[in-house]
């Protein structure tokens, strides 16, 4: 009686915990996770700051085209005023001077304009890099999202396996008591049940780790829920079309192309160092002294021009020019290499998607056959027509089939996003939405600290879990 009361209290407590968790947990779809992750990720902030740094570099380059204004002032105090033999003052008692100076220096090759163009191209490159970083990050978020769903499914599969082996254990125990089975069959059942409990513990911890990783990556609260979405399996994979899309839309290719243009502009900038530099200056000066001499001039305005041509610098300019040419060649080679790698990446992503799409149907059939086989073998075992080994083989086949279907399903959804990323359309896909994606109200997975209890409650296995007795 006391045992039943304790069992009821534990069941009520677990139900209360589930209800409380459901009341406060926030639900997220993949797209909502995307948005939250982009707004809170430190990696995205770093990439955005790179754009800002590039903008500041352009401001610095622009400053070279604007004259520099300098204000100055001095005050001198002497021990005494002095005069020469002609009674002309050569040293006042004190003097002061102040004024404003404007300076502008530029190269006759206009290399300052080249620097400004390079800075503008650097902004475009940083923006392309930001978009590509977003694509990388969104795919990482999707991978973590599906890892959580996969871990939850794995936990459910483990619980179902634990339920089957518990039922089998009790059945073996009953048949052993009536002399139909030997002690070795019971020991085998106990061993399999213990292994299932170990798998359950591993699956529970794997789910906690996957949830923690998603929380770290996206900034969602720990007691979140994920709303699974059903993705259509009718997506076609046109490799040639995807390659053209990648060539036109991939921002990493655009970034490398911009890097090539910047390298070419850098060659022009380095070549400009061989040209003379011109300096212009204009000065307004005021002065005061006490006592003031007869020839003292208290105000003057003047300007000037200078021409500088460093004809020998130990080979520095030639080395810088050759270095710029080498970097230009490197940039072109890197761009060509990336284009070839993109073609392979698109083909690999497309073939992976087709493989998963084709194998998923066969794996689902295998799962159906494995489940029917297990049910048939269990009935035969109950009637004494099958051995313990037959049951274990059937259960192992069903367990493997369940895991394979889950892995293939979520890997397919991730592969679909990988194809979009490799073709350069992932960002547009996330912004615009996908009409093929529909919310599935029946696929809601609660991911809280009591998620393992919820899995049992939803499957009607909570009471059975607390009633397992191996004595």
Which stretches of residues belong to each language-model region?
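Small/polar (Gly/Ser/Thr/Ala-rich) solvent-exposed segments
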Residues: 45, 68-92, 103-132, 254, ...
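Bacterial N-terminal signal peptides
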Residues: 10-19
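Transmembrane beta-barrel architecture of outer-membrane proteins
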Residues: 95-99, 143, 188, 300-302
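Amphipathic alpha-helical coiled-coil segments
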Residues: 46-61, 133, 137-157, 167, ...
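Periplasmic alpha-helical coiled-coil/stalk elements that build and connect Gram-negative outer-membrane
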Residues: 4, 136-247, 349-352, 356, ...
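Sec/Tat signal peptide C-region and signal peptidase I cleavage site
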Residues: 19-25
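Residues on the lipid-exposed face of transmembrane beta-strands in outer-membrane beta-barrel proteins
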Residues: 100-104, 214, 305-309, 408
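Acidic, low-complexity, intrinsically disordered peripheral segments
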Residues: 24, 404-471
């Amino acid at each position: 009686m006391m045992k039943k009361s304790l069992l009821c209290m534990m069941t009520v407590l677990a139900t209360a915990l589930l209800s409380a968790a459901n009341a406060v947990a926030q639900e997220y779809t993949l797209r909502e996770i995307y948005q939250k992750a982009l707004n809170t990720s430190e990696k995205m902030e770093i990439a955005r700051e790179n754009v800002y740094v590039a903008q500041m570099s352009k401001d610095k380059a622009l400053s070279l085209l604007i004259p520099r204004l300098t204000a100055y002032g001095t005050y001198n105090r002497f021990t005494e005023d002095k005069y020469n033999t002609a009674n002309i003052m050569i040293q006042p008692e004190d003097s002061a001077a102040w004024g404003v100076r404007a300076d502008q220096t530029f190269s006759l090759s206009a290399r300052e304009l080249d620097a400004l163009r390079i800075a503008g191209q650097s902004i475009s490159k940083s923006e392309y890099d930001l978009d590509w970083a977003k694509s990388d990050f969104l795919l990482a978020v999707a991978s973590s999202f599906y890892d959580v769903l996969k871990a939850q499914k794995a936990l459910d599969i483990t619980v179902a396996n634990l339920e089957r082996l518990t039922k089998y254990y009790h059945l073996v125990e009953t048949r052993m008591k009536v002399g139909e089975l030997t002690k070795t069959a019971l020991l085998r059942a106990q061993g399999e049940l213990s292994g299932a409990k170990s798998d359950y513990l591993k699956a529970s911890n794997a789910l906690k780790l996957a949830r923690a990783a998603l929380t770290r990556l996206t900034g969602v609260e720990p007691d979140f829920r994920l709303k699974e979405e059903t993705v259509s399996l009718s997506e076609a994979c046109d490799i040639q079309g995807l390659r053209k899309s990648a060539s036109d839309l991939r921002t990493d290719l655009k970034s490398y192309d911009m890097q090539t243009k910047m390298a070419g502009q850098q060659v022009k900038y380095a070549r400009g160092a061989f040209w003379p530099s011109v300096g212009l200056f204009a000065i307004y000066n005021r002065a005061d002294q006490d006592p003031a001499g007869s020839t003292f001039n208290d105000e003057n305005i003047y300007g000037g021009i200078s021409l500088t041509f460093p004809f020998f610098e130990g080979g520095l300019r030639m080395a810088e020019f050759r270095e710029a040419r080498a970097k230009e060649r490197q940039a072109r080679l890197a761009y060509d290499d990336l284009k070839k790698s993109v073609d392979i990446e698109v083909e690999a992503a497309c073939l992976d998607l087709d493989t998963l799409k084709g194998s998923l149907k066969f794996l689902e059939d295998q799962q159906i056959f494995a489940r029917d086989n297990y049910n048939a073998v269990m009935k035969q075992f109950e009637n004494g027509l099958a051995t313990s080994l037959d049951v274990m083989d059937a259960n192992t086949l069903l367990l493997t089939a369940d895991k394979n279907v889950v892995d293939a399903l979520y890997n397919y959804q991730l592969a679909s996003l990988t194809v979009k990323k490799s073709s350069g359309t992932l960002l547009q896909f996330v912004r615009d939405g996908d009409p093929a994606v529909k919310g599935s109200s029946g696929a809601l997975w609660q991911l809280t600290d009591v998620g393992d209890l919820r899995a049992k409650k939803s499957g009607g296995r909570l009471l059975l879990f607390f009633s397992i007795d191996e004595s």
